[in-house]
Amino acid sequence: MRMYETIFIVQPDLGEEELKGISARVQEVIVSMKGELKRLEDWGARKLAYPIEKFNRGRYYYLRFDGDAALIAELERRLRLNDKIIRYQSVKLEKEAPAAAAIPAKVTEEEPVEAAPEAKVETTTEEE
């Protein structure tokens, strides 16, 4: 099984019951196609970069799941057929991202910077 992530945007004017119904149907598709849902996040309503179907705002959802090609095809088909969903994008992830603690920080030693010697200004007076 491969890991995928999907972000979809729903219309901003939907009620809580409709939003729960949409997320339940998405979860149902993943489970029915023998996928494993890792994460489902509601990112809330945000301003869109440009108007989509006369909407300036949208409610964003983020999914991360394991599945096969048939699952992603069926999920995208269902997202496309739902007129309450105005955009979606699915991406195949190469592998699980390592935790930040697992990546060693690159340590560099800094040499102390010595202050530049102050320049002395000499003034000469001309004698007649």
From Swiss-Prot:
Region feature (Disordered): 105-128
Bias (Basic and acidic residues): 117-128
GO molecular function: small ribosomal subunit rRNA binding; structural constituent of ribosome
The keyword Transmembrane appears for this protein: no
GO BP annotations listed: translation
Keywords: Ribonucleoprotein, Ribosomal protein, RNA-binding, rRNA-binding
SUPFAM superfamilies for this protein: Ribosomal protein S6
PANTHER family: MITOCHONDRIAL 28S RIBOSOMAL PROTEIN S6 (PTHR21011), SMALL RIBOSOMAL SUBUNIT PROTEIN BS6M (PTHR21011:SF1)
Role description: Binds together with bS18 to 16S ribosomal RNA.
NCBIfam families, alphabetized: S6
Protein name according to UniProt: Small ribosomal subunit protein bS6
